[in-house]
Amino acid sequence: EIYSRIYFDQPPLSFASIPGMLEKTIILDGFSKTYAMTGWRMGYGIMPGWLVEAVNKLMVNSNSCTASFTQRAGIAALNGPQDGVAAMVEEFRRRRDAFCAGLNSLPGFRCAIPGGAFYAFPNITGTGLSSEALFDALLEHAGVASLSGTAFGAYGEGYLRFSIANSYEKLMAAVERIRQFLKSR
């Protein structure tokens, strides 16, 4: 539930809140998204007791020895004021609205407005290019980074993923670069 605090309208449903699902659910969360602590590699899991020992063995061998300053920062983030999180989410909302409107103004793009997180996932089938081809072309010719929808599996064909975790100005510039690229081909 790493994006559970970054939503714009309806709060996301936790599977653990569904009657009978708590004992069948593993919740993984961390500090990277909500508290902008990306790369600090600190998170936690909530799970049925019978899984704890096995998960602990896995974690000790894959991600151990979290630095003490990181742990202290996590405590401060959890116990401190949360108004910074709310302000960050509102800024993401502003960027989402403007960026998705910009994408929807591009020929061949259709972008549903995401309800949370900080990604836009437009359908690009109207461009006539595959996800991989447009991903490569935008990076090479327009200087705009995205991710091919096929990075998420075969059903991602026809889509790109863009992050809105950048400045408003850079996002608007990216839309214009994409527009210029589409005009030039």
Where are these regions (language model features)?
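PLP-dependent class I/II
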Residues: 1-185
